[in-house]
Swiss-Prot record:
Domain of life: Eukaryota
InterPro entries per UniProt: PHAX (IPR039047), PHAX_RNA-binding_sf (IPR038092)
Protein's name according to its UniProt entry: Uncharacterized protein DDB_G0292662
Region feature (Disordered): 27-66, 242-281
Lineage, broadest ranks: Eukaryota, Amoebozoa, Evosea, Eumycetozoa, Dictyostelia
Length: 383
C-alpha cells in the first residue's frame, strides 16, 4: 500500500528544498568571497613584500657603493688629478695622488677644497664655461704624505676601505681583483700603496711591461723551420737588449721548446712549429701587484699572494665583517738602496736605472702562484 503526499505536504517539502538550496547558494557565495578576499590580501602582502625587498636592495646597493657628492661636481672634475688621468692620460705626481686620496677619504673636512670649489662656481656662474686658458693649479692646493699618514682605517668601517679600493682600481684601468687590493692596502698601508701606484703609472706612461710566455709542450718537442727567402731572428738577451740577424740563404733552424728566440719567416715553404714564444703586455693591475710582490720578503709572500690566503681573508670578512692580516709596513724591501750599481751619490740616476732595467727584468720572471692570482681576476672569489 503506497502513501501519496497531499498537496499541502508537497508544497511544504518544496519550500524546504528551496530553503536548503538557498542556504547552500549563500554558503558557497560566502566561501568564494572569503577565498577571493584572502587571495587579494595575500597578493597585496606579496606586493608589499616585493616592494620592501626592492627598497632594501636599493638601500643595500647604496650602502655597498659609497658615493661622494663633490666628486661628481663638474667643478671638482676640473681640478681632479684622477679626472685628468682618465680624460687626457696625464700621469699624476705623487703629491697629486696624496691630494686625491686625502680629499675622497676626508669628505667635507678639507676647508681649502671647499674654498676652491666655491671660487670655481663663481667663475662658472650662469652656466658660463670656464675659459680655456684657465690654469686650475693657480687655486689648487696639495697635501703631503704627512696628511696621508693621519688617515687610519677602521676594520669595522667599510665605507672608507671601499672608497680607497675603488679609487685604486679606477687608476689601474678598472682592476677587478678588489679583494687582493683591499688586502694590500690594509697590510702595507695607504701611504706605501699610493707610492706603488705612482710607480705603476710611471711604468705605464713609459710603455708598460711585456712578458714572454712559452706555451707548455712535451720536453722532446723541437721546432724546425725551413725557409727559402729572408729570415729575421730576434733574440731577447737577459739584459733586455735585442740582437737581430738576417740571412737571405736557405737555412734550417732547430730549437727546443724552452728557447727564447722569436723567428719570423716570409714565404716559408716548409714549417713545423709547436711552441713559439708569445709576447704579452701585463695589465696595470698586474704590474702593481708584481711590484709589491717583489718588495715583500719571501717568508711573507704567501700571506698576501696566494689563493688560500685570499679565501681565508674573504671568509673571515664575511663572518666577522673584517679579516686578519699581517702588518707589513716596516717589512718591505728597498731595491733602491740595494741595487744602485755602485752609484749611491746620485739617487735620481740610480732610480732611473732601476726603473728601466732592474724592474723590467724582475717583472718578467715567472711566478706561477702570483700569475694564478692575476689570471684568475675574473673569478668570483676576486670580486
Amino acid at each position: 500500500m503506497s502513501y501519496t503526499n497531499t498537496k499541502e505536504e508537497t508544497q511544504i517539502i518544496n519550500i524546504e528544498n528551496n530553503d536548503i538550496k538557498k542556504r547552500k547558494f549563500i554558503e558557497n557565495n560566502n566561501t568564494n568571497n572569503n577565498t577571493n578576499s584572502n587571495t587579494n590580501s595575500n597578493n597585496k602582502n606579496n606586493n608589499n613584500n616585493n616592494n620592501n625587498k626592492s627598497n632594501n636592495k636599493k638601500q643595500n646597493n647604496n650602502n655597498k657603493k659609497p658615493r661622494l657628492k663633490f666628486t661628481y661636481d663638474y667643478n671638482y672634475k676640473i681640478i681632479s688629478p684622477f679626472q685628468k688621468f682618465l680624460d687626457y692620460g696625464i700621469c699624476p705626481t705623487l703629491n697629486e695622488l696624496y691630494s686625491e686620496f686625502y680629499h675622497i677619504l676626508n669628505e667635507n673636512k678639507c676647508q681649502k677644497l671647499k674654498m676652491e670649489l666655491d671660487e670655481l662656481k663663481k667663475m662658472n656662474k650662469g652656466d658660463k664655461p670656464i675659459p680655456i686658458d684657465f690654469d686650475p693649479s693657480k687655486i689648487c692646493h696639495q697635501h703631503s704624505k704627512e696628511d696621508i699618514e693621519q688617515i687610519i682605517f677602521d676594520p669595522n668601517d667599510r665605507h672608507l676601505i671601499e672608497l680607497a679600493v675603488r679609487k685604486f682600481c679606477g687608476f689601474l684601468q678598472k682592476e677587478s681583483n678588489m679583494v687582493l687590493m683591499e688586502m694590500i692596502i690594509l697590510s702595507i698601508g695607504l701611504l706605501k700603496s699610493i707610492e706603488f701606484l705612482h710607480f705603476t703609472l710611471e711604468i705605464e706612461r713609459d710603455g708598460g711591461i711585456f712578458t714572454t710566455v712559452i706555451p707548455k709542450s712535451s720536453p722532446n718537442t723541437t721546432t724546425t723551420t725551413t725557409s727559402t727567402t729572408t729570415t729575421t731572428t730576434t733574440i731577447i738577451n737577459d739584459d733586455n737588449t735585442l740582437i737581430t740577424t738576417k740571412d737571405s740563404n736557405e737555412q734550417t733552424s732547430s730549437s727546443s721548446s724552452s728557447s727564447t728566440a722569436i723567428t719570423t719567416n716570409t714565404n716559408c715553404s716548409n714549417s713545423k712549429s709547436s711552441s713559439q714564444p708569445i709576447t704579452r703586455r701585463r695589465t696595470p693591475g698586474g704590474v702593481f701587484y708584481k711590484l709589491i710582490n717583489l718588495h715583500i720578503p719571501t717568508e711573507f709572500k704567501s700571506n698576501l699572494f696566494s689563493i688560500s690566503s685570499l679565501f681565508k681573508y674573504k671568509n673571515e670578512r664575511k663572518k666577522k665583517g673584517f679579516g686578519t692580516l699581517l702588518d707589513l709596513k716596516d717589512k718591505l724591501l728597498d731595491f733602491t738602496s740595494n741595487n744602485s750599481n755602485g752609484n749611491n751619490d746620485n739617487n735620481e740616476n740610480s732610480q732611473e736605472q732601476i726603473n728601466s732595467k732592474k724592474f723590467n727584468k724582475l717583472l718578467n720572471e715567472v711566478d706561477e702562484e702570483f700569475d694564478k692570482l692575476c689570471v684568475s681576476s675574473k673569478n668570483e672569489i676576486m670580486t
